[in-house]
């Protein structure tokens, strides 16, 4: 599986099958990336999510992309870093849920943001490490998946994720 790390707008990835939404428990329009995904997808996305709320910590859900250029949206719920005893565990579970949903739906390409680093206050370096660790085990959970694109907001986040990815790659190989 190929991991791409880019600075880019997650709602403008037309060559990707599913975008990943860092969702709140109620699966409602929020701010940041979740807000951008909901706005771009249109009101049907929130309507489609309603019956599945509240989404459990670490869980995921797949819905159509509606007005997005992507057929699917995978919603995952990580934990608030500050108000939770095991935020790293739930971040890992959310990312694993994302991979399982991709596999179960024969999705070959995903675009995800820096899960948890906005409203959930995850330290970006920790989020980057956990994300890269899970992605380097993706073949176990999602053998069908070919490409994962991590879409980040700026060069500083790009540098953090590239560094974490290189670090995880070194430990996996060595």
Where are these regions (language model features)?
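Phosphate/ribose-phosphate-bearing ligand recognition and processing surfaces
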Residues: 81-174
């Amino acid at each position: 599986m190929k991991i791409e790390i880019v600075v880019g707008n997650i709602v403008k990835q037309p060559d990707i099958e599913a975008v990943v939404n860092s969702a709140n428990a109620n699966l409602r329009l929020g701010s940041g990336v979740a807000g951008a995904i909901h706005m771009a997808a249109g009101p049907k996305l929130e309507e489609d999510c309603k019956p599945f709320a509240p989404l459990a910590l670490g869980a995921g859900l797949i819905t159509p992309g509606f007005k997005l250029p992507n057929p699917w949206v995978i919603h995952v719920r990580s934990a608030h870093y500050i108000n939770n005893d095991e935020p790293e565990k739930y971040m890992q579970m959310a990312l694993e849920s994302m991979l399982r949903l991709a596999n179960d739906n024969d999705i070959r390409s995903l675009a995800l943001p820096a899960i948890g680093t906005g409203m959930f206050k995850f330290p970006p370096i920790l989020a980057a490490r956990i994300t890269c660790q899970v992605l380097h085990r993706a073949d176990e959970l999602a053998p069908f998946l070919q490409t994962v694109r991590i879409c980040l907001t700026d060069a500083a986040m790009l540098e953090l994720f590239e560094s974490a990815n290189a670090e995880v790659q070194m430990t996996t190989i060595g």
